[in-house]
């Protein structure tokens, strides 16, 4: 496994990250982003970092910059049904693979945020703990995945009123749990995540 600084210059490197792994509702999203060195510097200077450390306004402002400067990008998702069928790790890997498959050109190396390799990827890859702050491509992927998933959940909140989805994006807040106990789960809730709450 090569270290970040040992990746050959000129390699087409894709950063991959996911969002929504711990949610009770909706799909898990992933994004893959390929940047060159100039784009990396521009995005770091623009304030790019881990999406969880950015305000919603700052994240939204970075999306057009990422889209403008990246060489290619892809989004993927795996449904609540898939999460229930294969587990959250397997579903997350499906979402990541789908994001990678949407890139205009296959990468030479994939950087995966965290410490778990992408088992479905047969090419060269490297896990990067804390990748959102160490790799601009991973940080950019985290922003795109977060913005795409949040936009979907906002749309779905109109379809499934009463759960407060627009406020918590599907995470297991006290408000969300109270609504689940009162209303029961929707067709897009992850049943495997609700067993302890609903019995």
Swiss-Prot record:
Comment on bound cofactor: Manganese or magnesium. Binds 1 divalent metal ion per monomer in the absence of substrate. May bind a second metal ion after substrate binding.
Main localisation: cytoplasm
Ranges where the RNase H type-2 domain occurs: 11-199
Reaction catalyzed: Endonucleolytic cleavage to 5'-phosphomonoester
GO BP annotations listed: DNA replication, removal of RNA primer; mismatch repair
Protein EC: 3.1.26.4
One GO location term (cellular component): cytoplasm
Subcellular location: Cytoplasm
Keywords, alphabetical: Cytoplasm, Endonuclease, Hydrolase, Manganese, Metal-binding, Nuclease
An example molecular function term from Gene Ontology annotations: manganese ion binding
One Pfam family it belongs to: RNase_HII
Amino-acid positions noted as binding a divalent metal cation in the UniProt annotation, renumbered to this chain: 17-18, 113
Obligatory cofactor(s): Mn(2+); Mg(2+)
Function text: Endonuclease that specifically degrades the RNA of RNA-DNA hybrids.
Protein family (similarity comment): Belongs to the RNase HII family.
Name of this protein: Ribonuclease HII
Native organism: Synechococcus sp. (strain CC9902)
Organism classification: Bacteria, Bacillati, Cyanobacteriota, Cyanophyceae, Synechococcales
